[in-house]
């Protein structure tokens, strides 16, 4: 009897200890333990710290680039014209009128021509739409524009006055006409032109015609020199068949021609 009682007591003790251990594991994780309660009495400091961390993380996420696609494109980008980097042509526009002038754009808005190419004559032509281009001075960072009175000037912002229609002529020159301004009764287009002294002409002038040399501009763009593409082809040499060497026959001594004897026939009669 004593052994059976001891065994029962031992088994009951094991069952109770196992049940208590299982209750500890099943307890909810959200309840703070005694160690946590002792470190942060009241829970106010922890909540404020967690709230501050959450707000700082949310602010960092919102300020990260690409977090809000709607913000992209606002700010300074809305006030300036963004052109595609592909298809840009950088160089100068040479007008063959007079002694020849390069179209140049000044930072103060002045537009004229210079015989010698300089920093002001470096232009950048970019496409706006099909057949429509814009012209920007690289040094002045201003756009070529034509007012409603036909006067050429430089604009700090890209507007409709800065749009020109580019046409290729048969003599390899280009003409640039305003895309929005033209003579209303006849519908004649207004062209970018320079006079013989290099001054800008008004596009509304009846003398400014696409057939005149004052409206012809030759684009001079710097193209990168590509390395010469070449390759070497090795042509296999045809092996010549070995020439058969004829055996040398020793030259025999020339045969002596035998002495020829002439026989005369003698006919005897009687």
Swiss-Prot record:
GO cellular component terms listed in the entry, alphabetical order: extracellular region
Glycosylation sites: 112
SMART domains: FGF
Signal sequence bounds: 1-20
Biased composition (Low complexity): 50-70
Residue stretches of biased makeup (Gly residues): 40-49
Compartments, as annotated in UniProt: Secreted
CDD domains: beta-trefoil_FGF5
UniProt KW Transferase keyword: no
Region Disordered, annotated ranges: 26-84, 237-257
GO molecular function: growth factor activity
InterPro entries in the record: Fibroblast_GF_fam (IPR002209), IL1/FGF (IPR008996)
UniProt keyword terms in alphabetical order: Glycoprotein, Growth factor, Mitogen, Secreted, Signal
Chain intervals with Polar residues compositional bias: 75-84
GO biological process: positive regulation of cell division
General function of this protein: Plays an important role in the regulation of cell proliferation and cell differentiation. Required for normal regulation of the hair growth cycle. Functions as an inhibitor of hair elongation by promoting progression from anagen, the growth phase of the hair follicle, into catagen the apoptosis-induced regression phase.
Subunit structure: Interacts with FGFR1 and FGFR2. Affinity between fibroblast growth factors (FGFs) and their receptors is increased by heparan sulfate glycosaminoglycans that function as coreceptors.
Family affiliation: Belongs to the heparin-binding growth factors family.
Name recorded for this polypeptide: Fibroblast growth factor 5
Organism encoding this protein: Canis lupus familiaris (Dog)
Taxonomic placement: Eukaryota, Metazoa, Chordata, Craniata, Vertebrata
Chain's gene name: FGF5
């Amino acid at each position: 009897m004593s052994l059976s009682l001891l065994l029962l007591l031992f088994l009951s003790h094991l069952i109770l200890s196992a049940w208590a251990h299982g209750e500890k594991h099943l307890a909810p994780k959200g309840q703070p333990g005694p160690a946590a309660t002792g470190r942060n009495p009241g829970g106010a400091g922890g909540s404020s710290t967690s709230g501050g961390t959450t707000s700082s993380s949310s602010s960092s996420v919102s300020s990260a680039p690409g977090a809000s696609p709607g913000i992209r494109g606002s700010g300074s980008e809305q006030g300036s014209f963004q052109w595609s980097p592909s298809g840009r042509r950088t160089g100068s526009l040479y007008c063959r009128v007079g002694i020849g002038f390069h179209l140049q754009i000044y930072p103060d808005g002045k537009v004229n021509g210079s015989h010698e190419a300089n920093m002001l004559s470096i232009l950048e032509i970019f496409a706006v739409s099909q057949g429509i281009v814009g012209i920007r001075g690289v040094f002045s960072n201003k756009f070529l524009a034509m007012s409603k009175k036909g006067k050429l000037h430089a604009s700090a912002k890209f507007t409709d006055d800065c749009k020109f229609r580019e046409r290729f002529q048969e003599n390899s020159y280009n003409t640039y006409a305003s895309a929005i301004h033209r003579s209303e009764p006849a519908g004649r287009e207004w062209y970018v032109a320079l006079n013989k002294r290099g001054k800008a002409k008004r596009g509304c002038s009846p003398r400014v015609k696409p057939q005149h040399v004052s409206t012809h501009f030759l684009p001079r763009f710097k193209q990168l020199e590509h390395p010469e593409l070449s390759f070497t082809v090795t042509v296999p040499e045809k092996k010549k068949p070995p020439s058969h060497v004829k055996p040398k026959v020793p030259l025999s001594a020339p045969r002596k021609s035998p002495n020829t004897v002439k026989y005369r026939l003698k006919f005897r009669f009687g």
